[in-house]
Structure formats: C-alpha cells, structure tokens
Amino acid sequence: MPELRLSGNCAHMSDHPLLRRLPASTDCSSDELLSLFLDYIAEKKLELYPAQEEAILELFEDRNVILGTPTGSGKSLVATAMHFRSMAQGRRSIYTCPIKALVNEKFMALCRDFGPDNVGMATGDATVNRDAPILCCTAEILANYALRDGDRAPFREVIMDEFHFYADQERGVAWQVPLLTMSKSRFLLISATLGTPDFFQKEVTRLTGAETVIVSSTQRPVPLEFSYVETSVDVTLQELIAANKAPVYLVHFTQNDAAQAAQDLMSLNFCSTAEKTAIKEIMAGAKFTSPYGKEVKKYLQHGIGIHHAGLLPKYRVLVEKLAQSGLLKVICGTDTLGVGVNVPIRTVVLTKLSKYGGQKVATLSAREFHQITGRAGRRGFDDIGYVVAQAPEHVIENSKMEARAAGDVKKMRKMVKKKPPEGFVGWSEDTFKKLQTATSEPLVSRFQVSHGMLLQVLSRPDDGCHAMLKLIKDSHETAGAKKRHKERAWQLFRALIDRKIVEIVPVAQRGGGSKLRLNVELQEDFSLNHALSLYLIDALALIDPNSPTYAVDVMTLCESILEDPDVILRRQLSKVKDEAMAAMKADGLPYEERISKLEELEYPKPNRDFIYNTFNDFAAAHPWVGQENIRPKSIAREMFENFRSFADYIHDYDLHRAEGVLLRHLSSVYKVLAQTVPEAAKTESVQEMEAWLAGILRGTDSSLLDEWERLRDPNWKPTEEKPAEAPDITRNKREFTALIRTEIFRFLRPLAMQNPDIALAALGAGAAGWTADQLRALLDEYLAGHERIRLDNEARNGRHTYLKPDDSNQTWHVSQVLIDPEELNDWQIEFSVDLRQAREEGKPFLVLLNIGPVHAV
C-alpha cells in the first residue's frame, strides 16, 4: 500500500498528542514506535495493567490479539496503540463496534488524539472523511469492506470491539465476515465476555498466517462486592445511598418497569436542596416539549434518572450528562447499560435474575449477567463496585410477614405465604452465586447469506461467484448449514439477475474483467440494508403516480418493509377494538358475537390486499425471501393523513413511555423515503411528504436527523461540543412550510366537520379574540355557496398554500385556499406565523387573521 500523507495543520499538532508523536518517516522499528507510545502513556499519567502491557507488546510484534478482560480494564487504550502503530507505518486501521453512539464517542476521542483530518466515521447512513487513516464504524460497514474487497481491503489493522456480538442472532454475521476474508490484516478482538476463545485463536491464525495471542484476565481494576437482599427496592436504595454507594443503576428488563420504578421512587428524597439546585442549573435551557417530557423533567429535578430505548435521545443524553456530574443518585433503566451506555455507576441493583428473551422467560445467561454487572465501579473514582440482587417479590413479602411474626408460633401458623405468579421463573441466592463465577457461554456462529452480502461480493473486479462460494466454504458453520447457504446464495443470485440489479456481461465485452456488472442506475446512496428493499422497488412500479393517494401509498410501502414497533401496533389494535365494541353494543349484538368479531380485527393496514398479494407473487418468484415477511401498517401515514403532530399521536395512543419508539420508526421511514425510494418515483407530493416527516423529526428531537444530515455532509468536521441549543425548525423552508400546513389542517379538519370550538382549541393562543359563534357565522356564510370544505389529497396540495414573508423575513403571512367540490376555490383562511416564536417553541405558532373570499394580499 502506498505511504499515506498525513493531513492537518502542523501548528495544531500539539493539540493532538499522538499526532505530535508520529515519526517523520514510516521506516521506524517496532521498538521505536513502542517507546513513542509509552511516552504518550506517561504524559497522560497512566499506569498499564499487566494485561494491557502484554496486549500492546504483542500488537507491536505484529501478532493478532484476542483481548478478554473485564469492563473498565483499559481495553480502549490497547486499541489506540494499534491505531498509532498502524498510522506511524503509513497504513490504515479500522475500529468497529455495534452501537452508533459508541462509534461516535470513539470517533471524537480519536480525533482528539490524532487530529480530525486523520479520523473518519461511518455508521451505515453515510460517512465522514471515509479515506482517513483511521476509520470508526459499525460492524456492518467493516463487513461490507470485507465482502467487497476481500484481502484487498484497505485496512491493515482491524479492531473489533464488543466481539461477543458475533453470537447475535440478527447481526452476528457482520462480526464473522472479516475473519473469513481479510487475510492480510491483523486483528484485535475485544470483549469482556468472550467465553472460551480458542476457536477464534485458531481461525484468525489460519486466516492471516500470523500468530494469534489470547490475553485474558479476571482481575478488575475496581473489584466487585456482591450481595443478595430480601428487602423491598425502596429500602435497598435508601440503605445503599446512606452507605455512600450511589450512583445506583436500578436494572429492569422492560422499559415500562423502568418508567414505573422512577414514578414509584418520587415519594423518596435522595438529594439535598443544594444538589437539586445544581441539577436545575445543568438542566437550564433543556427543552421538555414532548408529552412525556414533563415526567422526565420531574424525575430529574428530584434526582432520579431514567434511561431506556423508549425515551427520546435528547432525554437520554441529558440523563448521561447529569450522571457524569454525579448529581443523580438513582437511575432507573433497562439492561442496555451492558452495551456501552455512558453512565458512571458505583452500584448495580438487579431487580430480577430472569428475563423474557423473545420466546420464553429464562434465567440470565452468564454473558448477560457479566455484561450488566461489569458496569459497577468507576475506575479512578471508586475503590470498589457493588452488585446487589433483589430476591423475588413474593420471597420479600414472605420475609416481611415472618419478620412481623417475630417467631410467634400462632402468628406463623396463621400466616398465608404469598405464592409466585403463574409461569414465574424464579431465582435464589444460589442462582446469584453461580452466575458470579460462571464462564460466558461459547459464541455461536450466526452466518447467513443475504442479497446485500451477495451484491457486495459480486461487485469485486475478479470472479465474485468464486469468492462467494469460498466465503461460504470458510464460514464457521456445519457442513449441513453450508449446503443450505449455497442453495440460498443461488436463489439470491437468480433474484438479482431477474431484477436486473446484477447483469451477466457478454463474453465479448469482458476483456479479462468481471463476468458480472452491477446496475448503476439507482441513486448513489441506494440502500439495500433492508431485506425487503427489492420488493419495495418492484411494488413502487405497480402503483399509479397519478393516483390522488400515490404519496401516502408510497409511504405505506416504506412502512411495510420496516420492523413492527409492537407497542404502537398494540395500542392501535386496542383502539380499533374499543371502537368496534362500542359500535356493536349500540347495534345490540349479543356478547358472544361481539367477542367473536373482536378476534377478527387487526390494526390498520392500508392497501392490505395489494401488499400481501404482490408480496406473495414476489416471494413465489424469489424463494430467497425465505423467512422474511411483509408488514403492512399505518403509523407515519396515519399521522400524515390525519394531520397529527408527534405530540398528538403520543396522546392519541397513550405512548408517553414509548416516545423514542415512535421517533425511531418515523426516522426509519424517513431514511427509506430519502435513501431507498428512487428519485424517479418521487413526485412533488412525495417530496412534500418527505419534507413534512423531516420537519416532524426536527421539531421533536433533532438529534437523529442532525446525525443523518451531518453524516451526509462530506465537509463536516468534529468540533468541541457546545451547549445544546434548540433546533431551528425554520432553517429548512420546505420542512417548515409542511409543518405550517399540518397545523392549518389541524384547524381546518374540525372546522369542516362544523366543530368551531374544537377548531379554535387546535389553534390555542393563536385563536385569541375569536369566538365559536364568529366561526360558526363565517362557516354558515361559506356553506351557503359551497357544499363543504374538502380535506382530500387535492385539498392539501401545496399549491393551495401561499406564503408572503415580511421585509425582515421574521413573520410570514400565510393564505390557505379552501377547496370545495364545485372547485370554485374562492375562499381563503389567513394566518400570521412568527418565525422567532417558532424557533423558541420548536413548532409553528399560527395566529388566525381572517376567513373570507379570496383577495389580494
């Protein structure tokens, strides 16, 4: 590989300690490089643990290393050493882990050490500084390099963090692929819960031809103290805090349990007045505008954190910030803390030792237990970390009754012991002790063939078909499984040929090159991340772009290829059943018949028959679809069609504790619209719908959208973090206009249904000075010459909305033409919109000015 020229301004090298230490020439011995890196460690006043020292020495001897040491034992420093050696020798290195937030965190840390010009990042959506000497990415990005380039992959050093994800059912294949193809690389595999790594030692040595060394240790920088208690959670927490063992992370295995625990703890006082004042100071400027925001704010001001995937990202970030300041005594969260959640913890309290794993409730695995408990104890802050396990609730209750009986035989006889709930998977102190010493289970191969994998391999300049067969042959699978993978690969290949995404190059045109050619007509960032994307491309061609419902039908297809957000769909079905039950009661149907009919109901599935029928046809012709299935649903579509804001939808379905779930689904729909739907399929109405969705995301929690846009900007460079500011929802005119139009139709909808009171309520303070009687009189005047106000797709077409900014462009005059069945379209509603207020509140604020015949403005 040619020598890499280091970029960056030399005047600022002193700001980046490892960039400053890079030798002028790449012709430098390992001993010299090691000495330079040890100088860096000395400057940071760090002292290497034996395992760290051993691993670094082995890496500088050009060996592969499998590093299995506990959480907090400095594995990141070993990875940094590998990056330094690689860059000093003019090569490229790549760091990968499973979580985008961790990739971002590592990216920022490496930028500080090596300078931002020398570090890139990729998380699956887009990339920043892709060709930098150091790249931080998710495992799937590395897997794509490994599939597309094989042993020609541009990275000589490969660091795979959280390597136990190798056994993840869905994503594990991404951790395996580099170990099958990147034969010219050196590997550093990192995990605190590897189990027995001998198999990987042999495989990595076989692949690279270089020795692979296992460096392992059970010695923790901060030792753990374990205890099992039969006291209620509130008593346990009070005792821990009194003993100076905070911050405490209270572990639950469902988001709802974590949220309920935070609510239950509000009756206890964990923080002093001074601490609460400090919390309020840090929270100053934070916006809690979502429906659940008031609850989150209340918990935080009381010194109680909450942390789970159902929260909006901005709230999780705030919780982490407060926790890092040492101001939160208790954090109620889920077991996701085991995967790199940036929350400092002294004590971990396990509320249970069993959890639902998707199919059944079972005792925690050794790996799950060690991942969770390993977060207790903060290196540099704590001398010891604490792990507390709660006994089952019925055991705690029985223990309380026995304590009240105080050995009184009569009371003991009368006592009725509480029984565990039906189907309960219990645990005991013995269970707890066994988990403490248990070795993590062996990592199981999750290799699988997908059309995305096939596309990457077939894009190689040489014989991609042969490379695909070799990939399957070298996989860590059984002989029987390899046979099935070959069959599936053939089915996938035929499907890609049939869809013309892959073409066979005629012999006369090959000229010694590849036998295959990828179709390059799809947009540059065309995404095949979703297994059903090929179906989406097919189905888009079957719907009429001139149909008045074309835009929402496109959205339905996008939603159909995404995973089901179950909590939202359950609430939708519940609402459908409630409405059906009320209607059947009114019709006088017998109870048994009502119950029978309820069982037949399902949540809304627009174009249900079209989607199922076209998908069945697609699956019949393309057996590679395998276990995949289409999932029609209407969440983003329902919001769009019914003019619902994010807050409206949360209230409609009581999703306060699952705001993050709704945000992620909407974000996924937006990404499919933006990245997978071909530009040729995007009519003006689709583009407007896409802008509306972007506006909803930006106004709710801009972090996901900002990351998406930042990563799509090739010129973006990291800077020091600044205090968080509210997102400017007015910066994108198209998005902001779409939000204004949604607010207009939130007013128009009840007005069209002759409910002026509800219409005024929709405007809130923007209806000041107006009365329901005034609206009713104007509506009567309108209806005297028009049948009704239309609310269909034509009525909401953007061409019927007119904007006129004032000279300062801080206030817009907005006119909305009312569309009627006679198509006279001669009335309008006028509003003013204050952009300053919109920026402050994170949503457009409409003031009603006038309703009447169209006139020049």
Where are these regions (language model features)?
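Helicase-associated low-complexity/disordered flanking segments
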Residues: 1-65, 273-301
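Conserved P-loop/Walker A NTP-binding site and adjacent catalytic elements of P-loop NTPases
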Residues: 38, 45-222, 229, 247-252, ...
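Conserved C-terminal RecA-like helicase domain
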Residues: 94-96, 104, 111-120, 255-330, ...
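Conserved two-lobed SF2 helicase motor
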Residues: 131-147, 302-316, 322-342
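Conserved interdomain hinge at the start of the Helicase C-terminal
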Residues: 229-253, 260, 317-325
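Non-catalytic terminal extensions of ATP-dependent helicases
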Residues: 305, 324-325, 411, 415-757, ...
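Conserved segment of the helicase C-terminal RecA-like domain
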Residues: 347-350, 354-356, 362-403
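Compact beta-sheet-dominated globular domain cores
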Residues: 819-857
